[in-house]
Amino acid sequence: MAELPRLNNIIRALEAGQHALTCFAPAHTDSAVAMSASKYDGCVFEMEHNPWDSGRLRDCLQYMLNRAQIAKAGLVPPVNPLVRIPVNGVEMAQ
């Protein structure tokens, strides 16, 4: 069976012994659009220190999609999204 290509640019860079470059961005749609066109391997949406808003996260992930890039590169996203989420447990009081 042929080996499937990595869909995650961060893992692909690390496996090749390269540096994976990511940035932190606020979870807003304008940030998502800007990050989707950037040269970073990944983007970390900072949602840890804000009230949890799954709708805002959904919008950010949707705005990172670019139909032209999908048609050109297939399923491999140019920038992989990561999300810092708020804690949910005993550690909230620390």
Predicted features and spans:
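Expand to "…catalyze enediolate/carbanion chemistry for C-C bond making/breaking, isomerization
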Residues: M1-Q94
